[in-house]
Amino acid sequence: MLYEKFEYNINNLIGNFGLSKIAVAVSGGSDSVALLYLANIWAEKNNIELSVISVDHNLREQSKQETYYVQNISNSLNRKHYSLSFDHQNNFSNLQERARAGRYDLMTNLCLEFDILVLLTAHHEDDYVENFCLRLERNSGIFGLSSSNINWYNNIQIIRPLYNIPKSELVEYLVSHNIKWFEDESNSSDKYRRNIIRQKLAKGAGYIKAEIILQQLKINDLLDNKFKPELISAIAEAVKIFEYGFAFLDLVKFDKFSNEVKVQIINFLLIIISGQFRAARFYSVEPILKLITQDVNFKNTLHGCVVKRIQNELLIYREFGKKLPESKILLDKSIIWDNRFCITKNQENPDCVITYLSLEDYKTIKKQLDLAHLKDLSCKNHNAILFTLPIIKILEKVIAIPHISYYDNDMQNFEVSFAPNFVSRFTHFC
């Protein structure tokens, strides 16, 4: 039965996590509505608080009806429902990608607000097959062609318990239980490449889908047994990440690893240093890899970072002005700034604002700054890095730059730590 398969999947994916809360993303389509009912049964059996999240992308007239329908289902199941809205700002370029990122930003921020650590999504077996075909068309490497049933976004664990369940089984479950759902009319449009691939797969023989699933399993196995261990070794051996939010890559050690792993190392560092949630495209990383092989110093920008070769090392630091966050008021004891730094205040301070250093501020306090340590660690790139660090201001006056122990008043006491979104157990800070 479908529920037994779902229960086996979710228990294996979550393990002994000791959860008391969990969220499920539900759009109103057949996949996510089926997931909601399955997750509700599982949550009841395990005494877990289940929250339902819907995101209206404001792109279709039907979307508000879908959200209202999901809200009614949630109410009937005595589950909390949260309706979120994505603002596309009438910008329709690269809309699918932006909408996806916006959707996950909204959902994971809500999870963080309510201390929910896990979000369930309705990606099923057919979705995995379509993703494989799309990535194959884009000439993705082995990491890109692999699939994962557990991912992280904004420090929230995204779990896909329907990964080995075809859409047909989900629809059959809903029909047998007389449960309605909405069909997204855009799914039949030839405007999107995914839909064209879906139509071709539907017309093809069943063995084509089975062969794709088999190939993906082989790739996942190769990744787990060869490339992931190599990636762990590469990062442990060749990477140094500093509390100032920059990193050095030892290019001599880097050179001995496979090209697939090299791409992942660069992307790993770009995600951590930029504070972004998503990796750069391969076509963006490839020019950097080519420059590295030329054995000459260079300085490029990529993915919100400056990438600079200094002899046998690659320095990566945050690019100034590239979507650095606006000022944030430090209302609570601690705050995450730029998705990279955690700032904690050890005493009450009125109207503290976290921001970055402006040129005017720098000119005012320049003579009082001790940058010797940062200068030494960063191979004299201290000034560029300084302008990407968090500072604390009161009434437009800089009162603290904790990284370099600058305090306008001895009574002002703050702590700062580098806390990027994507940190693995083999990452070490210097």
Curated annotation (Swiss-Prot):
Q: What's an example GO cellular component term for this entry?
A: cytoplasm
Q: Which residues does the annotation say bind ATP?
A: 27-32
A GO molecular function term, named singly, is: ATP binding
EC primary class? ligase
Q: What Enzyme Commission number(s) appear in the record?
A: 6.3.4.19
**Database matches in InterPro entries:** Rossmann-like_a/b/a_fold, TilS/TtcA_N, tRNA_Ile_lys_synt, tRNA_Ile_lys_synt_N
Localization recorded for this chain is:
Cytoplasm
Family in the record: Belongs to the tRNA(Ile)-lysidine synthase family.
Instruction: Give the function comment from the record.
Output: Ligates lysine onto the cytidine present at position 34 of the AUA codon-specific tRNA(Ile) that contains the anticodon CAU, in an ATP-dependent manner. Cytidine is converted to lysidine, thus changing the amino acid specificity of the tRNA from methionine to isoleucine.
The protein's name in its UniProt record: tRNA(Ile)-lysidine synthase
Gene name per UniProt: tilS
